[in-house]
């Protein structure tokens, strides 16, 4: 009975996922870009850690249920205390209307996470409490298991990462168009070569628009034909030469390769 109840809850969540009350402006960019429309990506969260009595943004993440957040494994440290900010647009405004801060109950890092090779770069955070969904706080859809997107499929990366290489962290949420790069192209020797595996997805690489430091863990948002948005990727790594290096697209953990793992951890 418990399993049926959990499944019913997940299905109910899925039926109302990925539809923001405030549709995004789809012409903006991240590095070298513009601010996102406030609350147009209401599943975007800020993962924050405590240092010297101050909460600091470290990574992005995606709300996929009222008490679960997807992020990257490389964002997690066993020595840090975390909280999750939901419903945020401007990180400089502590008491921003429609936002709240939630403690962390449990963090599941993929047991095969490899920090050297950056493989299985995925973590699931269980929040200390359920958050009430609203116009500013909503959940993203999960992609269908093992699904792939075609070359040049238009997706958007979002986050509060650096505005340019070695630049300042953004106060307001940023967004940027990141067309999908097919695996055959991204794994070419003059692109990412053998470092890119089929459990990853590449997007961008035009040398102009890109994710950057601080965007890690955040979503690659891709819109379905029915208008809803799914988190198809999790920001994993980019080029050391800079945040918007040509032929070095941002590499994302491909969420559709981990659906079974996500479902397993959500039912613990």
UniProtKB/Swiss-Prot annotation:
Known function: Regulates activation and degradation of trypsinogens and procarboxypeptidases by targeting specific cleavage sites within their zymogen precursors. Has chymotrypsin-type protease activity and hypocalcemic activity.
Listed InterPro entries: Peptidase_S1_Elastase_sf, Peptidase_S1_PA, Peptidase_S1_PA_chymotrypsin, Peptidase_S1A, Trypsin_dom, TRYPSIN_HIS, TRYPSIN_SER
UniProt-annotated catalytic positions: 74 (charge relay system), 121 (charge relay system), 216 (charge relay system)
Keyword Isomerase listed: no
Tissue-level expression: Pancreas.
Effect of substituting residue 263 to S: Found in a patient with chronic pancreatitis; uncertain significance
Result, substituting residue 220 to R: Rare variant; results in impaired protein secretion
Signal peptide interval: 1-16
Pfam family of the protein (one): Trypsin
Homology family: Belongs to the peptidase S1 family. Elastase subfamily.
Protein name from the UniProt record: Chymotrypsin-C
Taxonomic superkingdom: Eukaryota
Disease: Pancreatitis, hereditary: A disease characterized by pancreas inflammation, permanent destruction of the pancreatic parenchyma, maldigestion, and severe abdominal pain attacks.
Alphabetic keyword roster: Disease variant, Disulfide bond, Glycoprotein, Hydrolase, Protease, Serine protease, Signal, Zymogen
Domain Peptidase S1 stretches: 30-267
């Amino acid at each position: 009975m418990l399993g049926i109840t959990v499944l019913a809850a997940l299905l109910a969540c899925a039926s109302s996922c990925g539809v923001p009350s405030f549709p995004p402006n789809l012409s903006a960019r991240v590095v070298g870009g513009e601010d996102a429309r406030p609350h147009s990506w209401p599943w975007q969260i800020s993962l924050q850690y405590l240092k010297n009595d101050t909460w600091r943004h470290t990574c992005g993440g995606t709300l996929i249920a009222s008490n679960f957040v997807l992020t990257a494994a490389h964002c997690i440290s066993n020595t840090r205390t975390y909280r999750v900010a939901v419903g945020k647009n401007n990180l400089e405004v502590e008491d921003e209307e429609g936002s709240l801060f939630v403690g962390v109950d449990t963090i599941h890092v993929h047991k095969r996470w490899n920090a050297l090779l950056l493989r299985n770069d995925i973590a699931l955070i269980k929040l200390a409490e359920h958050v009430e969904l609203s116009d500013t706080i909503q959940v993203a859809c999960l992609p269908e298991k093992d699904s792939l997107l075609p070359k040049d499929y238009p997706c958007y990366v979002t986050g509060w990462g650096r505005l340019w290489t070695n630049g300042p962290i953004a106060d307001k949420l940023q967004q940027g168009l990141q067309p999908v790069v097919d695996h055959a192209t991204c794994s070419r020797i003059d692109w990412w070569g053998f470092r890119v595996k089929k459990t990853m997805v590449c997007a961008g690489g035009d040398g102009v628009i890109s994710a950057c430091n601080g965007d890690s863990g955040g979503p690659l948002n891709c819109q379905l034909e029915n208008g809803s948005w799914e988190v198809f990727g999790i920001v994993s790594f980019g080029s050391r030469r800079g945040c918007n290096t040509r032929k070095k697209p941002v590499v994302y953990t491909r969420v559709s390769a981990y659906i079974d793992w996500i479902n397993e951890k959500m039912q613990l």
